[in-house]
């Protein structure tokens, strides 16, 4: 789309990255793009770095759904969110200059912690901050599903299923399926206490509610993608699939499952 000409570069400051981005900015201007200094002015936001930098870029620019996010890897290979390589500038220019840009949409999750709202691209995690079993009543919609005892839980988007969720044996979910995945962290299962003991998937119209049992473990660590949210006396966390999505450039040779194969196999 030719009206997308304002580009904002998001990256972690370092001498090496500053020099690399200086060259990218010059190249962008040579091809008719306008480099802007605030993300609110941009309709293309380029994240320079790995997947962690991409998550930061999306969060720091407020999960905009009216622009394109572009992930550019620095280290010579692509990542799950970084479709381009910083050394392959021809591919970047060709894709962003195209009259008919194909767009890939990634869903977000809405998270509410005691009435305070957040959004995540990968996952929200809630864990004990002390060496003590964490107890939560788990509700699916209005149904009391179980009382969880263990280290915590992860609730992930389909794209986030490849991250923290996968490292604790959660399933990788096709992002074309609108859902959230709930994965336990070290659940306590014995003759006295019982949880489901496996990940489970909820459809887009379901709401998950975690009610914290106030037994001295009411100061949990809540992870919002790769950021920690610190708060005391947490009573309730609600999670659902958001109606909002972010957009990235879709490449013909870089589908989600090609990325999964490239990353893990």
Swiss-Prot record:
One of its GO terms (molecular function) is ATP binding. It catalyses: NAD(+) + ATP = ADP + NADP(+) + H(+). SUPFAM superfamilies: NAD kinase/diacylglycerol kinase-like. Its cofactor is a divalent metal cation. GO terms for cellular component: cytoplasm. The active site is at residue 51. Keywords: ATP-binding, Cytoplasm, Kinase, NAD, NADP, Nucleotide-binding, Transferase. NAD(+) binds at residues 51-52, 122-123, 149, 151, 162-167, 186. It is an enzyme of class 2 (transferase). Its EC number is 2.7.1.23. It is found in: Cytoplasm. InterPro entries: ATP-NAD_kinase_N (IPR017438), ATP-NAD_kinase_PpnK-typ_C (IPR017437), NAD/diacylglycerol_kinase_sf (IPR016064), NADK (IPR002504). Pfam families: NAD_kinase_C. GO terms for biological process: NAD metabolic process; NADP biosynthetic process. Its main location: cytoplasm. HAMAP family: NAD_kinase. Belongs to the NAD kinase family. Involved in the regulation of the intracellular balance of NAD and NADP, and is a key enzyme in the biosynthesis of NADP. Catalyzes specifically the phosphorylation on 2'-hydroxyl of the adenosine moiety of NAD to yield NADP. This is NAD kinase 2. It comes from Bacillus licheniformis (strain ATCC 14580 / DSM 13 / JCM 2505 / CCUG 7422 / NBRC 12200 / NCIMB 9375 / NCTC 10341 / NRRL NRS-1264 / Gibson 46). The gene is nadK2.
């Amino acid at each position: 789309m030719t009206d997308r000409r304002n580009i904002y570069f998001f990256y972690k400051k370092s001498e090496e990255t500053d020099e690399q981005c200086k060259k990218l900015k010059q190249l962008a201007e040579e091809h008719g793009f306008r480099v802007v200094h605030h993300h609110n002015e941009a309709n293309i936001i380029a994240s320079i770095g790995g997947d962690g930098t991409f998550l930061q870029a999306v969060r720091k620019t407020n999960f905009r759904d009216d622009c394109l996010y572009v992930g550019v890897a620095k280290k010579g290979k692509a990542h799950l969110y970084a479709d381009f390589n910083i050394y392959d500038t021809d591919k970047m220019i060709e894709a962003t200059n195209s009259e008919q840009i194909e767009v890939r949409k990634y869903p977000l999750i809405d998270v509410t912690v005691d009435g305070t709202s957040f959004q995540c691209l990968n996952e929200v995690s809630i864990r004990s901050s002390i060496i003590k079993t964490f107890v939560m009543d788990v509700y699916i919609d209005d149904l009391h599903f179980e009382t969880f005892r263990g280290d915590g839980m992860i609730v992930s988007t389909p794209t986030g299923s490849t991250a923290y969720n996968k490292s604790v044996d959660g399933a990788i979910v096709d992002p074309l399926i609108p859902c959230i995945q709930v994965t336990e962290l070290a659940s306590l299962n014995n003759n006295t206490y019982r949880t489901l003991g496996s990940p489970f998937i909820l459809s887009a119209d379901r709401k998950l509610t975690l009610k914290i049992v106030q037994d001295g473990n009411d100061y949990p660590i809540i992870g919002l993608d790769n950021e920690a949210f610190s708060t005391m006396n947490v009573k309730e966390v609600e999670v659902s699939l958001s109606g909002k999505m972010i957009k990235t450039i879709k490449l013909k040779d870089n589908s989600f499952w090609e990325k999964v194969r490239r990353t893990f196999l």
